[in-house]
C-alpha cells in the first residue's frame, strides 16, 4: 500500500526527531545505527568510535525499532500526534520526551530480545553502564550484554543437565587442566618430556576451537603415534571432566554449541528470544564462536558484527580472520558499512598506518582519515645499540615531562618481552616511574587458589581436583597415600571422591585416615548448610575459621605468612565488592564471575598512577596514549623471523604493526638499534621492512640525510658490518657454546627453519638446545604436532625447505 500524504509527513517528522537523538554521530556511524534488519558487518577502523555505534544501535533498536525508515504513520496516529511531534522537534521539552519517543517507535525490541557479545568483562560492563544512562537501569539490566563465556554460562546453567552434567558444575582454569593432564599421563605411563602437558592442553584446546570431539580428533590421527596418544588423553580428559562435573573455558562455548545443535527446543527458544544479535571484536572470533553466533541468530537473521580485519592479531589463540573476511558469504544479503573517520590520531599517524597495512593482500580494505591535520612527523631513531636506544627513549620522556607532560602520557611497545629489560634498567637509572602492563598475579597465588578451591568444593563436592588440593590444607593427617586409596575406592564404586571421604569408615583400606576424612566431609557439609542462610562474606569467614586456614598462617608468624594472610583478606574485599554490586549475590555467580576474570580486567584495577606503561603490542590492543614508542623496529625482531617465508604469518605481523601505530594519539616514535646483544651474540640488524613501508615524507629520521630515500634501501648503512638475522643468531649462540675436548657439535638447524621430515611431513624448528654433544630439536609439525628429536638422528630423515 502506498503511503498517504499524512504517512509521508508523519514519517518525515519522526525521522527528524530520531535524527536529533543521534545528531552527534557522523554519517557512517548513523547509517550503522539505523540499519537494524538483516545481517550487517560494521568494519570499524581503529579509533572510529565503534563502542559508541554499538551502544546507540542498541538504543535505537530498543527505543525506536524500525521507526527510522518506516514509511507509514502508526495506525492510531492523529493530526494532534503529528502536531505534538512537530512542536517537540521545534522545542524538545523534557516533560514531552516520553510521549515523543513512543510516537516514534515502530516495533521496538524489548530489552531482553537483544544480546550483545563482547570479549572482555570490561567491554561488557561499559556497554551495560552506558545503556543504563540512556534507557534506565531496569531496561538495561534485561539486555544480554555479556562476554562469550558469560552468555554461554547462562545458557548452560539452565540446560547442561541434558549432557549429563549437574547444573552446579565447576570451571577449571589452566592450572587445574594441567593437573588433570598430568594425572592422565601418569595413568598411561607417558613421559611428560615427550607429551609436555602444556603442548597437549594446546592441542586439545585447538580441537575444541574447531568443535572436534575426542572421537573426531581420533579419526584424524592417520595412525600417527603422537596424535593417537593425544586422542586417548583427550578422551580420558573429557571423561574425567564429566565425572568431576567440571568444564574448562573451551567447554563453555563448545558445550553450548552442542546443546543448541542437538536439542531443537533449546535452539528454538533462544532463536525466538533474541531478535537482535550483536558481536564486538568479530575479527577475534574462532570457529566455535562463529557457529555459536550463527545458531543464536538463526531465527530472525538480525545479526550485526563489529570488527576490523586489519586488527586481527590473535591467530595464536585460535582466532581466524576468515570469519570477518567471509561474512558476506556466510550470511546472505549482508550489508557492509565502513567506519573510517578516526577520532584518536593525527593525519600523519593515520597515513602511516594506512600505508603499512595497504601491503596486506587478505583484507577488506579501508582508509582511515581524520580532521586532525598537520600532526607531528613520525620520529624514526636508529641508535648504535640497545643501550643507546633505551637511553634515547628515556631522554625524550624526561624532556617532555620537563615541558609539562605527564609520565602517564607515554607508552613503550615491543614485539617481545625480551626487549623490555634494557629499557626498564634505563628508566630506573633515570628515575622514570613505569609499570609493566600485565595480568592476574593475584589470582595465581597459592593461598588465593586454596580459598577458591574451598568455595568451589562447597558449591560442587564432586570436584575431585579442588577437593584433593584442600583436603590436607592445612594439614589434617590425611596423607597422599590415603587420598590415592580413596580415589581407587571411588573409581571401583563409580562414585565421587567426596562420597568415599564422607563414609571413609566404611572402607577397611582407609581405616587409618577414616576419622580425619569424615571430619573433613562433615565440615564441607556444614559449609553447604551455612551457605543457605549466611551471606557470602560471612560464609567466607566461616571457611577461614573452621578450616583452620587462617590459624595456620597466623601460627607461622613470618613475613611470607603475613603477606599470604593479607592476600586472603584481600579476597574478602573482592567478595564484599561483588555483594555491593549485585542485588542477589550467590556463591555460584561469584565463582563464575571470578573464573571469567580476564587479564585486561585485572590490569584495569591498577591505580591510575603517573607512570609510563610498558607492554607488548598484543597487550596494547584497545588502548591509546598521547605518545607511543615502538622499540625494536628491526627485521627478525619485528616482523619476527618466524614469519619469514609465510605470507599468512607476515600479514599478521603487519596487522600487529598497524595496531601499534594506531595506539598513538599525538606523537609516534619508532626506534631501532644498529646492533643489539641477544642470546649472548651481537646482532647486526636490518631496519624493519614495516618502517620501510611508511612514506618518507611522513618521517623525521636520523637514519639518513637523504629525506627522499626509501627506508628499504637503508640496508647499505650496514655494509660495514656483517648482517646477521635473529634466526642465525640463535644458531650462532648455540654453536658457540664452550667446546669440550671431544669434537664440538655444530647444529645445521635453527629456530624458524622450515623443514620437511620423511615421516612427519612439513614443520618448523621452534627451539634448539645443546645436549650431550648433540642438539635437541623441538619441531612443530603441521600434521602431528610438536616433537622433540635429536639432531644427529633426525638429520637422516629431514631437510630444510
Residue ranges and their predicted role:
Residues 48-54, 69, 74, 89-107, ...:
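Helicase P-loop NTPase motor core
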Amino acid at each position: 500500500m502506498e503511503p498517504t500524504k499524512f504517512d509521508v509527513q508523519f514519517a518525515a517528522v519522526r525521522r527528524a526527531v530520531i535524527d536529533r537523538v543521534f545528531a552527534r554521530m557522523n554519517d557512517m556511524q548513523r547509517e550503522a545505527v539505523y540499519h537494524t534488519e538483516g545481517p550487517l558487518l560494521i568494519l570499524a577502523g581503529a579509533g572510529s568510535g565503534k563502542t559508541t555505534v554499538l551502544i546507540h544501535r542498541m538504543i535505537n533498536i530498543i527505543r525506536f525499532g524500525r521507526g527510522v525508515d518506516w514509511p507509514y504513520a502508526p495506525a492510531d496516529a492523529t493530526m494532534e500526534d503529528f502536531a505534538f511531534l512537530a512542536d517537540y522537534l521545534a522545542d524538545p521539552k523534557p516533560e514531552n520526551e516520553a510521549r515523543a519517543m513512543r510516537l516514534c517507535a515502530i516495533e521496538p525490541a524489548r530489552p531482553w530480545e537483544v544480546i550483545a557479545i563482547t570479549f572482555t568483562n570490561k567491554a561488557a560492563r561499559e556497554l551495560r553502564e552506558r545503556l543504563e544512562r540512556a534507557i534506565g537501569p531496569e531496561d538495561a539490566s534485561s539486555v544480554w550484554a555479556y562476554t562469550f563465556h558469560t552468555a554461554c554460562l547462562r545458557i548452560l546453567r539452565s540446560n547442561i543437565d541434558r549432557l549429563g552434567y549437574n547444573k552446579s558444575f565447576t570451571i577449571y582454569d589452566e592450572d587445574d587442566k594441567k593437573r588433570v593432564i598430568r594425572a592422565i599421563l601418569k595413568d598411561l605411563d607417558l613421559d611428560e618430556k615427550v607429551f609436555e602437558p602444556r603442548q597437549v592442553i594446546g592441542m586439545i584446546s585447538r580441537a575444541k576451537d574447531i568443535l572436534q570431539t575426542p572421537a573426531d580428533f581420533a579419526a584424524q590421527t592417520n595412525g600417527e603415534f603422537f596424535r593417537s596418544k593425544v586422542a586417548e588423553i583427550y578422551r580420558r580428559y573429557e571423561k574425567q571432566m564429566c565425572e568431576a562435573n567440571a568444564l574448562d573455558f573451551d567447554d563453555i562455548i563448545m558445550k553450548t554449541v552442542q546443546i543448541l545443535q542437538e536439542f531443537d527446543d533449546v535452539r528454538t527458544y533462544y532463536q525466538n528470544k533474541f531478535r537482535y544479535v550483536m558481536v564486538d571484536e568479530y575479527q577475534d572470533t574462532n570457529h566455535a564462536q562463529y557457529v555459536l553466533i550463527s545458531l543464536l541468530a538463526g531465527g530472525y537473521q538480525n545479526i550485526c558484527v563489529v570488527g576490523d580485519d586489519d586488527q586481527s592479531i590473535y591467530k595464536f589463540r585460535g582466532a581466524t580472520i576468515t570469519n570477518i573476511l567471509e561474512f558476506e558469504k556466510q550470511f546472505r544479503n549482508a550489508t557492509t558499512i565502513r567506519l573510517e573517520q578516526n577520532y584518536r590520531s593525527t593525519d600523519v599517524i593515520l597515513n602511516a598506518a594506512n600505508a603499512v597495512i595497504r601491503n596486506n593482500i587478505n583484507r577488506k580494505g579501508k582508509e582511515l582519515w581524520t580532521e586532525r591535520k598537520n600532526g607531528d612527523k613520525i620520529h624514526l631513531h636508529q641508535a648504535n645499540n640497545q643501550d643507546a636506544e633505551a637511553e634515547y627513549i628515556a631522554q625524550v620522556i624526561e624532556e617532555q615531562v620537563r615541558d609539562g607532560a605527564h609520565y602517564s602520557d607515554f607508552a613503550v611497545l615491543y614485539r617481545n618481552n625480551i626487549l623490555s629489560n634494557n629499557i626498564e634498567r634505563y628508566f630506573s637509572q633515570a628515575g622514570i616511574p613505569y609499570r609493566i602492563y600485565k595480568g592476574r598475579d593475584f589470582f595465581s597465588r597459592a593461598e588465593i587458589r586454596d580459598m577458591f578451591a574451598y568455595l568451589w568444593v562447597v558449591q560442587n563436592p564432586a570436584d575431585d581436583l579442588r577437593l584433593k588440593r584442600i583436603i590436607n590444607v592445612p594439614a589434617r593427617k590425611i596423607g597422599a597415600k590415603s587420598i590415592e586409596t580413596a580415589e581407587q575406592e571411588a573409581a571401583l564404586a563409580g562414585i565421587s571422591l567426596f562420597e568415599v571421604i564422607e563414609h571413609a569408615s566404611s572402607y577397611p583400606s582407609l581405616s587409618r585416615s577414616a576419622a580425619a576424612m569424615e571430619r573433613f566431609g562433615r565440615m564441607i557439609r556444614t559449609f553447604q548448610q551455612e551457605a543457605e542462610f549466611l551471606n557470602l562474606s560471612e560464609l567466607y569467614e566461616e571457611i577461614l575459621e573452621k578450616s583452620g586456614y587462617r590459624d595456620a598462617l597466623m601460627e607461622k608468624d613470618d613475613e611470607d605468612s603475613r603477606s599470604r594472610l593479607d592476600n586472603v583478606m584481600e579476597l574478602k574485599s573482592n567478595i564484599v565488592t561483588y555483594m555491593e554490586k549485585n542485588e542477589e549475590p550467590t556463591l555460584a555467580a561469584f565463582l563464575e564471575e571470578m573464573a571469567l576474570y580476564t587479564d585486561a580486567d585485572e590490569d584495569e584495577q591498577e591505580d591510575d598512577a603517573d607512570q609510563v606503561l610498558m607492554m607488548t603490542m598484543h597487550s596494547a590492543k584497545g588502548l591509546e596514549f598521547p605518545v607511543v614508542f615502538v622499540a625494536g623496529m628491526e627485521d627478525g625482531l619485528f616482523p619476527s623471523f618466524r614469519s619469514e617465508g609465510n605470507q599468512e604469518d607476515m600479514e599478521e605481523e603487519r596487522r600487529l604493526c598497524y595496531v601499534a601505530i594506531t595506539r598513538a594519539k599525538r606523537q609516534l616514535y619508532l626506534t631501532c638499534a644498529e646492533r643489539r646483544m641477544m642470546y649472548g651474540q651481537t646482532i647486526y640488524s636490518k631496519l624493519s621492512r614495516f618502517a620501510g613501508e611508511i612514506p618518507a615524507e611522513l618521517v623525521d629520521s636520523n637514519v639518513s640525510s637523504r629525506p627522499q630515500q626509501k627506508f628499504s634501501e637503508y640496508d647499505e648503512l650496514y655494509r660495514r658490518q656483517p648482517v646477521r638475522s635473529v634466526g642465525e643468531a640463535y644458531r650462532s649462540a648455540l654453536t658457540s657454546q664452550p667446546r669440550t675436548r671431544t669434537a664440538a657439535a655444530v647444529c645445521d638447524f635453527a629456530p624458524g627453519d622450515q623443514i620437511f621430515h620423511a615421516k612427519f611431513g612439513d614443520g618448523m624448528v621452534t627451539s634448539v638446545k645443546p645436549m650431550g654433544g648433540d642438539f635437541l630439536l623441538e619441531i612443530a609439525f603441521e600434521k602431528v604436532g610438536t616433537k622433540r628429536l635429536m639432531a644427529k638422528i633426525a638429520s637422516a630423515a629431514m631437510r630444510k625447505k
